[in-house]
């Protein structure tokens, strides 16, 4: 009887151990499956972060002065494309940061919440580009009295000038250079996708030593300028150039 009881007890203990091991194995399998899925999701997210981003493909500066060497760069054109493998980049969430070592300016695109009463279409042009930096003299820009419907690149420049000088808005404009799928034509949320190219255009009004734009502003010769074009997600495009020691042309390639 005793041996039988001991045998039954041993069997019960053995069965209990098997059940505990089975439960533990189930927990381990479930946990490993969860961790595997989590790792795969994290890997995909990391890959997307690395691949996503924006690239600066060129920067041009413009001075309206005659001769050019007597003036400063008052306008910049920053050409951007998406990184290879990048998803769509909403330019409405992009920031352009510029610094000359004395100040750091942060430009943004139109925002429906911050810019109520304005239209996104004031700051984007998607037609043929005859000249991306049309000439303006002081009378042309100082006489701008309101926003205007955009029918040319010049209209975007004038609207940006008015926004900065009259409404104190740090805005950049967008000129569509290449856009096969029309993703950049959505003025409220222009999206830079594969094969697309856009020009971010901006005035250098913040680069003014006496805070009075009416008597001159801009980036002088031999000035080191650094910055970034920062998307909402992914890697930012690098801005890093030094302006020429002498401005010999009105339009200059800077980077």
UniProtKB/Swiss-Prot annotation:
GO terms for biological process: archaeal or bacterial-type flagellum-dependent cell motility. It comes from the Archaea. Residues 1-4 form a propeptide. Its main location: other. Pfam families: Arch_flagellin. It is found in: Archaeal flagellum. One of its GO terms (cellular component) is archaeal-type flagellum. Signal peptide: none annotated. One of its GO terms (molecular function) is structural molecule activity. Keywords: Archaeal flagellum. Coiled coil: none annotated. Belongs to the archaeal flagellin family. NCBIfam families: arch_flag_Nterm, PRK08541.1. Flagellin is the subunit protein which polymerizes to form the filaments of archaeal flagella. This is Flagellin B5. It comes from Pyrococcus horikoshii (strain ATCC 700860 / DSM 12428 / JCM 9974 / NBRC 100139 / OT-3). The lineage of its organism: Archaea, Methanobacteriati, Methanobacteriota, Thermococci, Thermococcales.
